[in-house]
Each structure stands twice: as structure tokens, then as C-alpha cells.
Amino acid sequence: MNDTTSKECPSGPSAWSIASQWVDPGAQSAPWWKLIGSQLCLLAQEARYPIEKQFEILLFLYAKVLPRVGPLNKGEKFNSPSRYTSLLTDDGTPFEYSWKWNNSTSSPDIRYCIEAIGSHTGSSTDPYNYLETEKLLTQDLASCVPGLDLTWFHHFVKAFGIDQRQMASNNPDAPKANMFVAFEHVQKGVVVKAYFLPAAEAGSGGPPTFETFASATRGVLNNTAALDASLDFVKNNEMGIDLVPDMLAVDCVDPNKSRLKLYVSTTATSFASIVSVMTLGGKITDVDRGIKELEVLLSFALGKETPISRDDELNVQSVFDKGLAHDFDLYGRMTYYFDIAPSSKLPDVKLYIPVIRFGRSDEAVASGLGQYLRLRQRDQFHDGFMRALGSIGAGHPEGSGHRLQTYLAVAFQRDGSLAITSYINPGVYHDDLKG
């Protein structure tokens, strides 16, 4: 057999190495493939995804996603006019990974979120970064992703005015709209999620309000009970009134099966404030065990040597680096989302703890989480997670200041356990990244 056409496999996860033999090294997306492709494949490999699923993730990424994130402009300054700065991460990287932890009988789920970036993104032609996202969903994915339904996507694009070509405010400092898209590779296929960050209120130039989101949401809900309960909490509860709305997300599936997720944030970080929001001021009941589990998890993940105080605010362990892509801190507030299902009377609530601020280090957060998982017989994949984290972080020299783990997300489960997800920023645009 003539082997003169064979290629040497690049080093990396096996599925990625094999696929890389046939990737055009001169393609615009090749640098993204080298970084993001290898890291996503490693996460899937360590989560013990079947090899065929790993190839599916890689093919989907290469064929559908990478062409919509623009070139990797490594080496340019953050404010370079040729480089759009994504709001997804603190260094402007338009990718974020997540690892949803297993329970005692399941395996982890790997997801990732992107901000689509085109040649006109951020310009007067596309001030709200709509065009590339719209192309990705309607041109690239609508015809090939089974079960994809863009009904709610189109509704909220129009409701928030994201498809407009004219700024809602003449104030250059007014909030700009942004859109993110996330992909969850489930056992059969992929679930697509869309995220909406509305622009400034028309006329006022101020940030969007709860009414901004409520007005848009009522247009698709026949049953507004869960939405109304959420709005009542933020208007009338002592802890709720400090919450501000940030973002809305939807699953791009049949609206009868979809969910609305309203993201909110607050400067309050005490355990009492967390419990208040997670229970909607006591309206969500039968979560006493979950609250105790959350207290234990926080003690481990945040490196507390004494029990968590109910009333004291959490101590900031890592301060905001003003030298990165944004002049404001993406991780300076405790974040939650209200999961509003069309058939529910109350929302489910998920907490996002910015461990990048309140955890001592990546090593400390991951090790503390591992201690908790071992106590609950859920640590079967922790060693793999640590290997993946070490590999992703290998490009950042020790002392670089880049923190991989951004959030630890937690939700109460019906059996009293916790649903836990770790979020990871690969830090592609961090100044110290090698390669």
C-alpha cells in the first residue's frame, strides 16, 4: 500500500488529532480549531463521551460554528479597531465552556457558548451584533439540526429591537445589545440556546428594566404565573429589590417544550441573601436539604475553614483586572436566573457564584469541589476534569493572573441534591497565553 499521502497526527485528544489531518491549515478558522477544537474534545474525552460523539462535536464545531466567530486576532490590542471585543468573557474571548457535573448514576454534560462575530459586527451596519447570529441560526443550522425551532428567537429579536440598524440611544456610553448562542451535545443531537442582552431603553438611554423583559416575555406566554411570581419578588421582597435584570435566554425548541431564563444579579453575597433569592423569599419550599448541601459546597469550594456565616458578605479573593478587555467587571456580582416554564406556577432558581472573585485560586476551587463530590459519591469524573483544566491552563504561565473557572452554578434538585456546573474561560485573548 502506498503511504506517501499519509499525514502525521497532531498531538492532542485522539478524535481531534485524527480529524486535524484533514483540516485546511490555511483556513481562517484553523487557529480556532487548534485551540478550541482540542480543548472541547479533551473535555468530552474526560467526560467519557463515546468516540463517535466526540467526532460529532468536532465536525459540528468546524463546519458550523468556527466560520461564524471571525478570525483569531491574537496579538492585537484590546481596543484595536479590527478586533471586536466579546462580552462573553473578561478578556474578550468569544467562547466559554461548561461542565455539568454528573450525579451518582450519570455522566457529565459538556456545553459551550459563543458570540458570533462577523465583518460588520459592532459597526453602524450591525450595531447590535445581530447579522452573524441570524446567519448562524437561520442559514447554517435551521435545515440540519433536528428539533431546532426559532419561533422564540425571532420573537425576542424583534421585541428587544436587536434586528434594528439604528441605535436606541445617541448616548455612546449607553448599553449595547449583544447575543450569545450555546450548544449542548446531548445523547441524540444538539440543543441550541439563544441569549439576549437588550440595548438601552429607547429614549432614556438607560439600562433595560424588568418591564423591558416582562413586556417581551408576555408576548409568548399563555401562563404568566411563574413570571408574575418572579416580578413580585423583585418588586416587593427586601432582597429581591436589589436585583437588576441582565439577560434572557431561551431553548430553541418547540415553544411548548422550551423555557425562558431571566438572568439577574446583585452585589449582595451573604448566604442569607442567596437563600432568599433561591427560595423566592420562602415561596419555594421543600429545599431545606438543598440549602444545607449548598452551605457545605460553598465551604469547600471557597476554602472556608469555618462554617459559612449567614449574614457576612463573602470576601473577594481576586480583584478585577482593569487591564483586560472591559472597563467593568463581568464577575463582580452574584448572578441568578429564574427558570420560567410555561406550565409552572413558580420559577426554578439557579445560582451562579463567581468563583473567579470569591475563590482563592483555580486549584483551590476545583479541589474543594472535589472534596464535596467525594463525600456525595459523585467524584468519578473529577480526576478527568482536573486533567482537562490543567491542559487548558497550560498555555497560561504560572502567575499570569488568568483564572480559568469563572462561575460555579448550583440549583436545587427534587431529591435534595445539587445540580452543579463549572464554567471555564479558555482565555484565548489573555496577554500571557502562549502559542
Curated annotation (Swiss-Prot):
Gene this protein is translated from: fscG
Protein name: DMATS-type prenyltransferase fscG
The protein's role, per its UniProt record: DMATS-type prenyltransferase; part of the fragmented gene cluster that mediates the biosynthesis of fusarochromene, a tryptophan-derived metabolite closely related to a group of mycotoxins including fusarochromanone. Within the pathway, fscG catalyzes the prenylation of the primary alcohol produced by fscA which is necessary for the formation of the chromene ring by the oxidoreductase fscI. The first step of the pathway is the epimerization of L-tryptophan to D-tryptophan in the presence of the NRPS-like tryptophan epimerase fscC.
Binding site for dimethylallyl diphosphate: 111, 193, 195, 259, 261, 263, 352, 423
Organism: Fusarium equiseti (Fusarium scirpi)
Keyword terms of this UniProt record: Prenyltransferase, Transferase
Any one GO biological process: alkaloid metabolic process
Family: Belongs to the tryptophan dimethylallyltransferase family.
InterPro entries documented for this protein: Aro_prenylTrfase (IPR033964), Aro_prenylTrfase_DMATS (IPR017795), DMATS-type_fun (IPR012148)
Enzyme type, top EC level: transferase
MF GO annotations: prenyltransferase activity
